[in-house]
Amino acid sequence: MASSGGGNTGAGGTSGLGLGLGLGLCMGEATGDAEEEAAAAEAVGRLATSLWLRLRGWEAVLAAAQRLLVWEKPLHSLVTAATLNGLFWLLSSSSLRPFFLLSISLLTYFLLDLWHPRFLPDVSAPPPEEPHSDSEGAGSGAQPHLLSVPELCRYLAESWLTFQIHLQELLQYKRQNPAQFCARVCSGCAVLAVLGHYVPGIMISYIVLLSILLWPLVVYHELIQRMYTRLEPLLMQLDYSMKAEADALHHKHDKRKRQGKNAPPAGDEPLAETESESEAELAGFSPVVDVKKTALALAITDSELSDEEASILESGGFSVSRATTPQLTDVSEDLDQQSLPSEPEEALSRELGDGEETELAPPEDLLSAPPALSKQALDTEEEGAADKETLLQLSSPLHFVNTHFNGAGSPQEGVKCPPGGPVETLSPEAVSGDLMAPSSTLSPQLCLAESGPVTLLSPSVLPSLPQDSPQALTAPEEEEALTTEDFELLDQGELEQLNAELGLGPEMPPKPPDVLPPPPLGPDSHSLVQSDQEAHAVVEP
């Protein structure tokens, strides 16, 4: 166990040592790279400072040369380019020797150095502490969008150091791989020899001169980016067209292969070759249409409303949905309240009215002489009548016929009293209860009496009860609320006058305080009494 623990400890120590060495090497490489970068920056700074010290009197000349190269003033730049082109072709076409050209160049440099103090002012420069700062570039006479002398010196220094680095790498590659270096140099020289054989050297020199003159213009105005922006749509269109043509050729090639595989035997006639696809292939692209579904979709589409019709219905208070029936909204509720009952409601009211008459038709023995009804029978009849009235109120619309306001309060002379007794013999409770029935109960019968011929009403509408029967039937609270809303209240004087006209004396039992006095008998009430009399006359024989 101890030995195994020792082995594990040794393995852990070895791995830790390897990890430490790896980290040390990485840190050493990072430190070496940082030191190299710092040394390169220091070398660039020293070279830029030395160049700036030598060119500190040429700031104006360098600024003018930059303005000419970037074509800031097109006329001056055009004259300069024409002059340089003329000199180049003059020297190339002359028969002068190279030594003569070299001597002329040295003489020109000597004259410029001699005449510099007279024609070009001496511009004093600040001490070269930070030659690459913007403030010094602005004070050196250059424009803000052009390179100042310190910036130009810095770019030149960086270019020179980059060239030196590449030269050192090339020499190192030559020492390490001499055979590869020799092969590459020989291939490069052969390419230049072939190019010089087909293209004259003077033309190559002219191309180099034009590149030096036009390259600052291209970089300064970003002509390459602008040209690419304008040519990009054309290039994309060309690319798509080439892809389409390649796909078409590939498709034709595949088609020919398939036709070659499916070729008929030698005895059969060859089929006609066409550019279109076969019917089997084209049938795969055509959709399968169901006739029934298509007809149903067309019918639904034809039944839909147009946008104009939908807007008209919506403006009139109808909520319109596509392929549905227009429905009334809350805006048209006032129209429903003012409109007459519809045909289904009238039919329902007729059926309920007929059913009530049929159910309430008394037998013959009850029409002859009204026997004394017990209290229990009266309660049963009262509950049945209340249920039927509630059913009529729920099923039929509410109609109000104010015919009791048209009469003068007294019966007409031509009206005959029923044989069972005159109208005065009826108890005021029965008369008031019968005449003050809810409008929902009397509305179907009154509508039928006014619209069509007079029909015989059952005696249950106006029952002829004896005077001494204690039938002070009290209506439900809902009936009292309806009668209170439908009829106006009468004062005590009018109530006494009506009692005197009806022949009711003070010996009559007092009325309940909640029951209203009977309204005056109008023509409708007389018609009801007459119909009751005719019913009795028909039953008695």
From Swiss-Prot:
Cellular component annotations (GO), alphabetically ordered: endoplasmic reticulum; endoplasmic reticulum membrane; membrane
Positions of transmembrane segments: 75-91, 99-115, 199-219
Bias (Pro residues) ranges: 507-522
Positions with biased composition (Acidic residues): 270-280
Highest taxon above the source species: Eukaryota
Biased composition annotated in UniProt, kind: Basic residues: 250-260
Pfam families named among the record's database cross-references: RHD_RETREG1-3
Keyword list, A-Z: Autophagy, Endoplasmic reticulum, Membrane, Phosphoprotein, Transmembrane, Transmembrane helix
Residues spanned by motif LIR motif: 485-490
Compartments, as annotated in UniProt: Endoplasmic reticulum membrane
Free-text note regarding domains: The LIR motif interacts with ATG8 family proteins.
Function, as annotated: Endoplasmic reticulum (ER)-anchored autophagy regulator which exists in an inactive state under basal conditions but is activated following cellular stress. When activated, induces ER fragmentation and mediates ER delivery into lysosomes through sequestration into autophagosomes via interaction with ATG8 family proteins. Required for collagen quality control in a LIR motif-independent manner.
Family: Belongs to the RETREG family.
Protein name: Reticulophagy regulator 2
Lineage: Eukaryota, Metazoa, Chordata, Craniata, Vertebrata
Gene: Retreg2
